């Protein structure tokens, strides 16, 4: 089965379609982990990957970005020196009206009759300036974290930027 290009699903044109109790046959979410690295330690700094535009991010794109960022951080810093958090969940169900192609397709195809479509995947609906990934770590490793998040941001459909915040001492 051919996957449609992301440009078909990128924009927030329609309402969210999330009521899974009314639907059948929704593919599972590909995102495996939402928290990675050292989950117990408190770190003084956080670096976040933020989307510049409102968009829908497919679950496969979130998983690809997560794997890229986590692999780079694990290799550069070691598993105990960071905490990576994915801050969004793909609730929105994507639909596609399948079209028959090839010889004799016009006899089999329904065209636009009953064109509601079947569920083909899920996506996270993100607003402008929403944090997608956050890495908690020490200030000494900020350059390596920025590099890893920049690489992961290339796998997302919207332009991104980084926000660095230090936790307040109380």
Curated annotation (Swiss-Prot):
Belongs to the universal ribosomal protein uL16 family. Gene3D superfamilies: Ribosomal protein L10e/L16 (3.90.1170.10). This is Large ribosomal subunit protein uL16. It comes from Methanospirillum hungatei JF-1 (strain ATCC 27890 / DSM 864 / NBRC 100397 / JF-1). It comes from the Archaea. The lineage of its organism: Archaea, Methanobacteriati, Methanobacteriota, Stenosarchaea group, Methanomicrobia. InterPro entries: Ribosomal_uL16, Ribosomal_uL16_arc, Ribosomal_uL16_dom, Ribosomal_uL16_euk_arch, Ribosomal_uL16_sf. The keyword Ribosomal protein applies. SUPFAM superfamilies: Ribosomal protein L16p/L10e.
């Amino acid at each position: 089965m051919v996957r449609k290009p992301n440009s078909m699903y990128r924009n927030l044109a329609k309402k969210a379609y999330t009521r899974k109790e009314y639907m059948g046959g929704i593919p599972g979410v590909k995102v495996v982990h939402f928290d990675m690295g050292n989950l117990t330690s408190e770190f003084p700094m956080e670096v976040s990957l933020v989307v510049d535009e409102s968009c829908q991010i497919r679950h496969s794109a979130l998983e690809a970005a997560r794997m890229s960022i986590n692999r780079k951080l694990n290799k550069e810093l070691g598993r105990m020196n960071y905490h990576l958090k994915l801050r969004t969940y793909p609730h929105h169900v994507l639909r596609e009206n399948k079209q028959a192609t090839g010889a004799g397709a016009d006899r089999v195809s329904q065209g636009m009759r009953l064109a509601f479509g079947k569920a083909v995947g899920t996506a996270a609906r993100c607003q402008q300036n929403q944090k997608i990934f956050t890495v908690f770590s020490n200030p000494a490793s900020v350059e390596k974290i920025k590099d890893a998040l920049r690489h992961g941001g290339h796998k997302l459909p919207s332009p991104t930027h980084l926000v660095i915040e230090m936790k307040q001492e109380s």
